[in-house]
């Protein structure tokens, strides 16, 4: 018999949650035609939330030289997004994520076109905009330490 160490179990559960987010992120980025495969991956632990949000930097094998070889991916309990290598840190990636989501939210609430917005795989309803808005407010307040803009 082995004694169960609850502290260690928590670490295992956290690792499993990060791995689950990683597999989601890898699957998301590898679904794009311009990503031949993923080579390496880094997880930004400072801005991730256990089972809710993961910020990853992937080194990929791009389809051609017109595609960045480093891509940020944000996944979790919110719409997935990829960002190019002009983003330098996980914090900057999360800030850009919030900007992209806020643009979609604002356009939905104002009845404006979504043609220039990052594509969000959700119906453009006020209800979905409100749900996303609450998540973005949480990210800004708790992770980025900023008030809602």
Regions found by a protein language model. Give the residues of each.
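Acidic, proline/glycine-rich low-complexity IDRs
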Residues: 2-3, 15, 106-149
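Short, charged/polar micro-motifs that form catalytic or ligand-binding hotspots
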Residues: 11-15, 80-88
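N-terminal "first-domain core" detector
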Residues: 1-48
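A composition-driven signal for long, intrinsically disordered, charge-rich low-complexity tracts
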Residues: 37-46, 52, 72, 91, ...
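Short aromatic-glycine-(Arg/Gly/Cys) micro-motifs in beta-strand/loop hairpins
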Residues: 47-82
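An exposed acidic His-Trp-rich patch
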Residues: 83-123
């Amino acid at each position: 018999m082995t004694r169960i160490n609850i502290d260690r179990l928590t670490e295992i559960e956290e690792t499993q949650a990060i791995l689950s987010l990683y597999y989601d992120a890898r699957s998301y980025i590898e679904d794009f035609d311009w990503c031949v495969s993923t080579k390496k991956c880094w997880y930004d632990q400072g801005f991730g939330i256990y089972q809710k949000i993961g910020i990853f930097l992937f080194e990929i094998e791009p389809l051609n030289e017109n595609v960045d070889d480093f891509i940020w991916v944000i996944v979790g309990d919110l719409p997935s997004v990829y960002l190019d290598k002009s983003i330098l840190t996980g914090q900057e990636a999360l800030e850009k994520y919030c900007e992209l989501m806020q643009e979609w939210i604002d356009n939905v609430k104002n009845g404006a076109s979504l043609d220039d917005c990052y594509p969000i795989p959700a119906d453009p309803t006020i209800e979905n905009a409100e749900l996303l808005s609450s998540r973005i407010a949480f990210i800004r307040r708790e992770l980025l330490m900023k008030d809602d803009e």
